[in-house]
């Protein structure tokens, strides 16, 4: 089946066996559900498959194996095959290259940013937000509130799912991406209240969708005494337990001052 190797690669990575290779493969340049149909190549590794195919910095990557490239998720998924057909544009003309390489090997192209676009920021205002509690005067990057499912897959970040769409979730399922989810509570009304986001409760359905599709989700609960503990915590744990073995949960207790 076409792209079976790519799918196999994603399964290997999602099971945690990609390790060092995953970092080397993905660190250069994932998934917004947006149809960005091309991306500029900013560099090419020496002696790489792309270099051998005479792909150059300044070329525009159009497609891989007939698939338009929206971001690095597409890039790594479709480039995993041992036979890779790459279409680039140079000086207004499209140029097709057929590249033979070891299965899963990176093509060796570099892009303008880690994600090929902007990070998705957090749209919540959680009552216990750790970033809001950080002291001033630290490096600026520490104050950025990311909520990007791509970084969850690549770096292990936790995401709330509140800025994802059904299309995003289907793509996660199709590509077999195991991600980490900040749950906090499975009570929709309480989740909206804790996260100050009116969509937070509805997005809980994505957890069930992903778990029932066979993905493994690492979940966390920031337990705030008097708010989502007691009966609410028992409800949350019971709901998550019903999705075992596809749910792995961690319990983190926040200090009381966090939400006063």
Model-derived regions, located:
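Conserved Radical SAM active-site core
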Residues: 94, 103-247, 254-260
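Conserved PDZ fold ligand-binding element
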Residues: 50-70
């Amino acid at each position: 089946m076409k792209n079976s190797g790519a799918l196999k690669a994603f399964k290997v990575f999602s099971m945690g066996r990609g390790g060092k290779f995953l970092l080397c493969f993905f660190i250069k340049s994932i998934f917004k559900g947006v149809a960005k149909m091309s991306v500029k190549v900013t560099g090419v590794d020496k002696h790489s498959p792309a270099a051998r195919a005479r792909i150059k910095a300044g070329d525009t990557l159009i497609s891989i194996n007939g698939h338009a490239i929206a971001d690095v998720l597409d890039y790594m998924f479709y480039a995993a095959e041992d036979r890779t057909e790459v279409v680039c544009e140079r000086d207004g003309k499209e140029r097709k290259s057929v590249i033979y390489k070891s299965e899963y090997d990176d093509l060796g192209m570099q892009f303008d940013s880690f994600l090929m676009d902007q990070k998705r920021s957090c749209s919540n205002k959680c009552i216990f937000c750790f970033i809001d509690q950080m002291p001033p005067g630290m490096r600026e990057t520490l104050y950025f509130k990311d909520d990007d499912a791509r970084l969850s897959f690549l770096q292990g970040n936790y995401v709330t799912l509140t800025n994802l769409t059904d299309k995003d979730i289907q793509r996660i399922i199709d590509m077999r991406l195991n991600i980490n989810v900040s749950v906090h509570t499975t009570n929709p009304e309480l989740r909206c209240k804790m996260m100050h986001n009116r969509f937070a409760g509805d997005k809980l359905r994505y957890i069930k969708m992903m778990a029932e599709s066979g993905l493994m989700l690492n979940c966390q609960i920031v337990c705030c005494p008097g708010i989502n503990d007691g009966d609410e915590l028992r409800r949350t744990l019971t709901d998550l337990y019903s999705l075992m073995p596809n749910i792995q949960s961690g319990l983190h207790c926040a200090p009381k001052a966090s939400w006063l």
